[in-house]
């Protein structure tokens, strides 16, 4: 699957570079990843089906963990 990976607080990962997102997505077993610069968030492609991605729901910033 593909989408914006989220942390424990259901928050997307902010980015400024593709390299950061590529590493973040690789850590989550995705095939590729990049920084989607229209909203400055990491986007992953080829994620495992059980990987959490952004859906409807609020970001709870206190839950940030990598």
Curated annotation (Swiss-Prot):
One Gene Ontology term from the biological process aspect of the record: defense response
The protein's role, per its UniProt record: Alpha toxins bind voltage-independently at site-3 of sodium channels (Nav) and inhibit the inactivation of the activated channels, thereby blocking neuronal transmission.
Organism: Rhopalurus junceus (Caribbean blue scorpion)
Gene3D superfamilies from the UniProt entry: Knottin, scorpion toxin-like
GO CC annotations on file: extracellular region
Coiled-coil boundaries: none
Tissues in which the protein is found: Expressed by the venom gland.
Alphabetized GO MF terms: sodium channel inhibitor activity; toxin activity
Name listed for the protein in its UniProt record: Putative alpha-neurotoxin RjAa44
Highest taxon of source: Eukaryota
Keywords from the named record: Disulfide bond, Ion channel impairing toxin, Neurotoxin, Secreted, Toxin, Voltage-gated sodium channel impairing toxin
């Amino acid at each position: 699957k593909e989408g914006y990976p989220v942390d424990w607080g259901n928050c997307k990962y902010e980015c400024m570079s593709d390299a950061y997102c590529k590493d973040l997505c690789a850590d989550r077993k995705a095939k590729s990843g990049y920084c989607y610069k229209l909203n400055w968030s990491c986007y992953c492609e080829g994620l495992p089906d059980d990987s959490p991605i952004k859906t409807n729901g609020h970001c709870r910033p206190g839950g940030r963990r990598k």
